[in-house]
């Protein structure tokens, strides 16, 4: 999982790729929260980074849904 992916890079991905990235990020967030609860988490900042990445993916998907942005290659997804 890339750290700190930009919204521009996310906009270049297809809907399927965004959905897969969202699933991976949510799984990572779950694992980080589990590590935090058991006291094994060493990088607390990673929680915030993953949450922000999830929000960015949701934002790009919503922009496409509303027609504010198109998918990769200028096509509506």
UniProtKB/Swiss-Prot annotation:
GO terms for biological process: translation. GO terms for molecular function: structural constituent of ribosome. The keyword Cytoplasm does not apply. The keyword Protein biosynthesis does not apply. Disulfide bonds: none annotated. One of its GO terms (cellular component) is cytosolic large ribosomal subunit. PROSITE patterns: RIBOSOMAL_L29. InterPro entries: Ribosomal_protein_uL29 (IPR050063), Ribosomal_uL29 (IPR001854), Ribosomal_uL29_CS (IPR018254), Ribosomal_uL29_sf (IPR036049). Keywords: Ribonucleoprotein, Ribosomal protein. PANTHER family: 60S RIBOSOMAL PROTEIN L35/50S RIBOSOMAL PROTEIN L29, LARGE RIBOSOMAL SUBUNIT PROTEIN UL29C. NCBIfam families: L29. Belongs to the universal ribosomal protein uL29 family. This is Large ribosomal subunit protein uL29. It comes from Mycolicibacterium paratuberculosis (strain ATCC BAA-968 / K-10).
């Amino acid at each position: 999982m890339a750290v700190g992916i930009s919204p521009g890079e996310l906009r270049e991905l297809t809907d399927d790729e965004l959905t897969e990235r969202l699933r991976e990020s949510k799984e990572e967030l779950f694992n980080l929260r589990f590590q935090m609860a058991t006291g094994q988490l060493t990088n607390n900042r990673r929680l915030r980074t993953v949450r922000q990445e999830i929000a960015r993916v949701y934002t790009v998907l919503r922009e496409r849904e509303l027609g504010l942005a198109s998918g990769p290659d200028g096509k509506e997804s």
